[in-house]
Amino acid sequence: MKAVMKVEPGYDKMQLKTIPELEVQKNQVKIKVAYTGICGTDIHTFTGQYKNSQTPVVLGHEFSGIVVEVGEDVTKIKVGDKVTSETTFVTCGECDYCLEKDYNLCAHRKGIGTQINGSFAEYVISREESVHVLPDAVDLKAAALTEPLACCVHAALEKTVVKKEDKVLIFGPGPIGLLQAQVVKAQGAFVILAGITKDQKRLELAKSLGIDVTVDIQKESLEEIVLTYTKGYGVDKLFECSGAVQALNQGLPLVKKKGTFVQVGIFSEKLNLLDQESIIQREITYIGTRSQKPSSWHIALKLLEEKKINTDKMITKIVPLDYWRQGFEAVLSGNEIKVLIQS
């Protein structure tokens, strides 16, 4: 089968190759891939910033498809099902985290598209436990965004709980920020989305998605806008989705005393300067959130089924598998929102 592989560490080092199809084991499901979203992790792997623990490996982990084969022990999934899948492929099954189904925290976890061959391919293998059958109202294109949506669900509804009376600030109008804003808005909260001048098209898209206020922080005073909408208190919750240290430190003083700051974006450096004074003096709860877990997926699919998340406006380009490089170049250019590769 055709597959896009990271063949060795370093910049690019990616090729479209023909590799053998994997055999389905007893508890596994073979999926004919329909669409795969290009994730920031895929881009960082392309540029060599993300250090894979294993190469060569087929990339791709945000996918949808149709089941073509199931293992003999599989009982809940059948051939012909339209599905998406969690990225978790291997866990120890014994640690405290696995016993609570917090697979995202298992020290022995291996994920599809990073350590295990992923979905930038004609077919992908997943374990039955990770596979979710799509509701009838969710199409294969929308389903390819379930994984990043589940990450946003985990951040907003599991690591903390957004309430309808909350005033919420979100940094970063990229795919994650736009999904995060929609998840928060679906709870009835008031949402302010902050970006920079080059994000103008994304901020305009956010307005069309129902986001209450968008701010170009290079042209407008974010502090003034936040304090105006919150009667001077600051926001109840802040989701930092850009992975920019400047946004982190600009945001902390804008959180209400006793408010919550959720770090969704990943920083390029392990250690960064942090406005500790704001956290301490304002009694801010600073929360880290990593990936997603099974419960996140159930909620994400429900949101998609109820049409509370608009994926159509976010998917701005689709390229065939053979032209995967055009898709990556489109993401790197910064001119697209979400790019899918069609297998």
Sequence positions of predicted segments:
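C-terminal hydrophobic helical "lid"/dimerization subdomain
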Residues: 3, 220-221, 249-253, 257, ...
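Glycine-rich beta-strand-centered segment in the early N-terminal region that forms part
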Residues: 22-36, 49-96, 135-137
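Generic hydrophobic/aromatic pocket-lining and core-packing "Φ" positions
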Residues: 42, 181, 203, 248-252, ...
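Receiver (REC) domain switch-region micro-motif
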Residues: 83, 168, 238
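NAD(P)H dinucleotide-binding glycine-rich loop of Rossmann-like/cofactor-binding domains
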Residues: 91-171
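Mid-domain Rossmann-like dinucleotide-binding core that forms the NAD(H)/NADP(H) cofactor-binding site
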Residues: 138-219
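Glycine-rich cofactor phosphate-binding loops and adjacent beta1-alpha1 units
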Residues: 160-164, 209-285
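Residues in the short beta-alpha loop(s) of Rossmann-like NAD(P)-binding domains
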Residues: 195-199, 267, 292
